[in-house]
Amino acid sequence: MYKRQVVTVYTPNSQDELKRLAYRMEWEDAFLSYLKGLEQEKPVIFCGDLNVAATEMDIKNAKANEKNAGFTKEEREKFAVIKEKGFVDSFRMLYPDTVTYSWWSYRFQARQRNAGWRLDYFMISESLKDAVADAKIHTEILGSDHCPVELDLEV
């Protein structure tokens, strides 16, 4: 029997002019409910593109993006609820002051200028905190507008 469950996720983008923000908010609630149901059985790790820069530290130009998909107040509040319900941002737990990104627009030479967003996460059930050995964001790996993220757990 497995001791933890892993879920990969792509969180819906709220899109230009926030056309899908309402849908995104409903999706967030349903996804959190799903995760909490899984957690009844065993601890959960979920990872992927959460399409939110959780804090000003997680985005290069916070003020200019406050009304843009991925950095709205509503999206950041939903991320905060995930944490309030017992899930931990593994990277931020280990590196609370590190500014690094996992996504850069293909426009405006954003990657070359490191004008990015941290959108990709490994979130873990609180009960797994002590098992986290490291969490990494591989900014050196190219090939996509996102870079890989990694979670190392003690077994």
Where is each model-derived feature located?
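Metal-dependent phosphoesterases centered on the DNase I-like endonuclease/exonuclease/phosphatase
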Residues: 27-115, 119
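Conserved small/polar residues in nucleotide/adenosyl-binding loops
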Residues: 1-5
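Short, structured patches in soluble enzyme cores that scaffold and shape functional sites
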Residues: 8-11, 48
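Short helix-loop capping/hinge motifs at secondary-structure junctions, enriched
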Residues: 129-131
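Short, solvent-exposed loop/turn segments at secondary-structure boundaries
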Residues: 18-23
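Surface polyanion/phosphate-binding segment centered on an Asp-His-Pro turn
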Residues: 136-155
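Short, well-ordered beta-strand micro-motif
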Residues: 10, 122-124, 150-154
